[in-house]
């Protein structure tokens, strides 16, 4: 599925509005560990800060994004990293050859997807046998509760609009259909510096999956 003009505008607005640096959150860095020599694909890489952080952890990193202007900025700042113009819902053929050890899908990616199955199928095609997927994203429950812990929207509503609320079950099911085995799912309270929530509800989650041999 090609990104619409509405998608691209929404992604640009979110990228510019974020107050914190776009590197890797500490808990993601801990989850990734040493990436020395590993081929890593970063989906929806934006201006490249998090992709560069992956390279600093030792990865042979590739960044993917559908916004040429952001990719041009990334190329100027980090010319040794490969930057690819493409949609995370329909990966370009050169990325679908089963060569990556790890695919990283970071915060904000899931909410920009209209085609969850296309995203999952692309991840599976990019990974080598037994390759890994790491997803770090906003927990869908956090978007349903306001600052006073009152439910402000329906968790079970169908996803729609530029920001889509994919339920955890829908994400896991899409990965299963793509023959990706979910090995762990961890939920975290609190939130990032741009999203602060009551610590009694989940704000973000980490999901680990592996391509079957």
Model-predicted regions and their roles:
Residues 117-132:
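A short glycine-rich, Lys/Arg-flanked "PGG" loop and its adjoining helix->strand segment in the class I
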Residues 162-185:
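Short alpha-helix
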Residues 93-103:
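A short acidic, Gly/Pro-enriched loop at the edge of an enzyme's catalytic core
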Residues 178-180, 195-213:
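Core SAM-dependent methyltransferase catalytic element
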Residues 101-117:
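A short SAM/SAH-binding and catalytic strip from SAM-dependent methyltransferases
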Residues 41-91:
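Class I SAM-dependent methyltransferase SAM/SAH-binding core
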Residues 1-36, 49-53, 70-73, 132-160, 189:
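Conserved class I S-adenosyl-L-methionine
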